[in-house]
């Protein structure tokens, strides 16, 4: 990660980046919205508005400073991508009679229980239901992932029958208990 942050982070013409030195806060504003990030006080931020790049510098090569340097750079890159393109997470619903539907600003999930699970949709995230898929859109990568994880937690995928809510393309291990038993026998 440290080699990636040696270069300045470029941003496109339609994105406005500003830095408040007193509050150590980077603000990224683009066509899809506005995001803010509190920068660690040890990290020095250099912003060049004419050449359209932002550079982060760390005070030392201690492992903590290297880690926080790479983390801050990755978060800023994700903010720039979020306000220009946005992020999408897709969940699939598998199971007989399992379905999801939108009712206003609430996602209603029928997942084989005696009652539907209700999930209030946060204002900074947009959710669409297409057949057996739930599409989650937003500009904040962390928020989109968090909402997807919360929806998935209503009915995690069953490794034996394959029923439940899973990420698109997620592979389930066929029999986790057997795999654990076999690994103990090998030792």
Swiss-Prot record:
GO molecular function: rRNA binding; structural constituent of ribosome
Keyword rRNA-binding: yes
Entries under PROSITE patterns matching the protein: RIBOSOMAL_L6_1 (PS00525)
GO BP term, pick one: cytoplasmic translation
Chain coiled-coil ranges: none
Subunit composition and interactions: Part of the 50S ribosomal subunit.
PANTHER family (alphabetical): 60S/50S RIBOSOMAL PROTEIN L6/L9, LARGE RIBOSOMAL SUBUNIT PROTEIN UL6M
Role: This protein binds to the 23S rRNA, and is important in its secondary structure. It is located near the subunit interface in the base of the L7/L12 stalk, and near the tRNA binding site of the peptidyltransferase center.
NCBIfam families associated with the record: L6_bact (TIGR03654)
Protein's recorded name: Large ribosomal subunit protein uL6
């Amino acid at each position: 990660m440290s080699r990636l942050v040696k270069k300045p982070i470029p941003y496109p013409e339609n994105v406005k980046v500003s830095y408040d030195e007193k509050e150590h806060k980077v603000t990224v504003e683009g066509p899809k919205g506005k995001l803010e990030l509190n920068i660690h006080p040890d990290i020095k931020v250099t912003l060049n508005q004419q050449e359209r790049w932002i550079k982060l510098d760390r005070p030392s090569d201690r492992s903590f400073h290297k880690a926080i340097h790479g983390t801050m750079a990755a978060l800023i890159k994700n903010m720039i991508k979020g306000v220009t393109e946005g992020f999408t997470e897709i969940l699939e619903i598998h199971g007989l009679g399992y379905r999801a539907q939108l009712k206003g600003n609430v996602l209603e999930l029928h997942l084989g229980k005696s009652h539907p699970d209700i999930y209030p949709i946060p204002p900074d995230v947009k959710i669409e239901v297409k057949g057996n898929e739930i599409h989650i859109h937003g500009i904040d990568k962390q928020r989109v992932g968090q909402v997807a994880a919360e929806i998935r937690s209503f009915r995690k995928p069953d490794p034996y029958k394959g029923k439940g809510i899973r990420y698109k393309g997620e592979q389930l291990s066929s029999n986790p208990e057997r795999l654990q038993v076999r690994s103990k026998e090998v030792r």
